[in-house]
Amino acid sequence: MVYRGFGLEHISPPVNKPFAEMTPEEQGERGAQMMMEFMTSCPGKSAISGVTGFALGGVFGLFMASMAYDTPLHTPAPVGAGPGAGIPGAPTLQQMADLPLKQQIKIQFADMGRRAYSSAKNFGYIGMIYSGVECTIESLRAKNDLYNGVAAGCLTGGGLAYKSGPSAALIGCAGFAAFSTAIDLYMRSENGRPPKNDFDE
């Protein structure tokens, strides 16, 4: 008997069984595979970045609002200012001082919640757009290098600032591109050449 080798023609493709006919182990593997495929796709990356950015933005906004103890309620109207000064509907400094402590705490927490939600929306929106644009550029170029982040940062920054005029769009493009380049350089710095031996640091 002559040995004819082992090639791809001898391999039968896996049977694509319906999900209901799979064993529990096969269903778990299929579910994990579908989850990984979604997470590595452009819509999945955009969704994950948006949710992560929303959470981080909320924490950041809450922290910044809690540190603004010297200017409560952002920029409240000074004592004796007209009715149109400061935040509409916000009490003045004198009015805040005259309120009971419980009411002051309630107003401050409401303001912190508004600032945290606003920051969360901005961070989530930026993260979702940037991740989606970068994934699309990477898919079109079929390359994973530094230029994807630069182009995505420029398009994201310019797109978010285009309503303010060409100058603002150009500044936003340059700023986001520089920031994304710095982050990519830092993240890729660990992927340099390995040391010549185990003793090189």
UniProtKB/Swiss-Prot annotation:
Top-level taxon of the source organism: Eukaryota
Function text: Essential core component of the TIM22 complex, a complex that mediates the import and insertion of multi-pass transmembrane proteins into the mitochondrial inner membrane. In the TIM22 complex, it constitutes the voltage-activated and signal-gated channel. Forms a twin-pore translocase that uses the membrane potential as external driving force in 2 voltage-dependent steps.
By sequence similarity, the record places it as follows: Belongs to the Tim17/Tim22/Tim23 family.
Put simply, this protein is called Mitochondrial import inner membrane translocase subunit TIM22
Tell me if Transmembrane is a UniProt keyword of this record: yes
Q: What is the lineage of its organism?
A: Eukaryota, Fungi, Dikarya, Ascomycota, Saccharomycotina
Keywords of the record, alphabetical order, are: Disulfide bond, Membrane, Mitochondrion, Mitochondrion inner membrane, Protein transport, Translocation, Transmembrane, Transmembrane helix, Transport
Where are the membrane-spanning stretches? 47-67, 146-162, 167-187
Q: What is its main location?
A: mitochondrion
Give the bilayer topology. Multi-pass membrane protein
GO MF, one term, reads: mitochondrion targeting sequence binding
Q: How does it assemble?
A: Component of the TIM22 complex, whose core is composed of TIM22 and TIM54, associated with the 70 kDa heterohexamer composed of TIM9 and TIM10 (or TIM8 and TIM13).
InterPro entries reported in the protein's UniProt record: TIM22 (IPR039175)
Q: What disulfide bonds does the UniProt entry report for this chain?
A: 42-135, 154-173
Subcellular localization, per the record?
Mitochondrion inner membrane
Q: Which GO terms describe its biological process?
A: protein insertion into mitochondrial inner membrane
Q: Name one Pfam family in it.
A: Tim17
GO CC aspect terms = TIM22 mitochondrial import inner membrane insertion complex
